[in-house]
């Protein structure tokens, strides 16, 4: 029962998780065992096949009620974005201080909504996921972060500007992001490196 509750809470926090991600997070040894555990939870979770033919799970209505989740998730082609974010969560040691889509705003100057905001080794980080996003949108995001940096608001509040972490799909996109992020403290991962 505790394991079921923990799985439901993970789905509440991260929205969508693949079977392999759930295995890593909750020690579900072996594919058969993982499928059995997740099949026994069908009353609380729904699933669909992802791009790589692996099941992707999310809370259904009963599961949302059980853990007090108000966000409704259904089958979506954007699941890859959420899976990339979940892999970043696992890579950064399943941080309890992890918050998704937290708004940072300096009125009438700039607003930034990172995919996640978290603390790792006592340092704050912004996470941005680049899953099939148009590069001009990524450029706009970087420009907004640079505007936020230029205001000095976060530096005054926490003593420094948080490190930017990007997860992207290709080396060429990584290089372009590195170029644009010049002047910011940034780490850029390829998704395959952190899976």
Where are these regions (language model features)?
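Polybasic (Lys/Arg-rich)
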Residues: 193-195
């Amino acid at each position: 029962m505790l394991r079921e509750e923990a799985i439901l809470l993970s789905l509440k926090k991260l929205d969508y998780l693949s079977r392999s991600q759930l295995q890593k997070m909750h020690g579900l040894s072996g594919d058969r065992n993982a499928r059995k555990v997740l099949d026994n939870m069908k009353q609380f979770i729904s699933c669909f096949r992802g791009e790589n033919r692996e099941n992707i799970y999310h809370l259904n209505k009963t599961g949302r009620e059980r853990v007090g989740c108000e966000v409704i998730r259904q089958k979506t082609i954007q699941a890859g974005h959420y899976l990339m974010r979940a892999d970043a969560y696992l890579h950064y040691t399943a941080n309890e201080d992890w918050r998704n889509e937290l708004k940072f705003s300096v009125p009438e100057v700039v607003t930034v909504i990172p995919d996640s905001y978290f603390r790792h080794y006592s340092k704050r980080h912004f996470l941005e996921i680049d899953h099939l996003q148009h590069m001009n949108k990524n450029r706009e995001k970087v420009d907004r972060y640079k505007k936020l940096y230029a205001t000095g608001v976060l530096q005054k509040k926490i003593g420094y500007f948080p490190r930017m972490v990007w997860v992207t799909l290709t080396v060429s996109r990584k290089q372009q992001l590195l170029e644009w992020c010049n002047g910011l403290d940034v780490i850029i991962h390829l998704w395959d490196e952190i899976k």
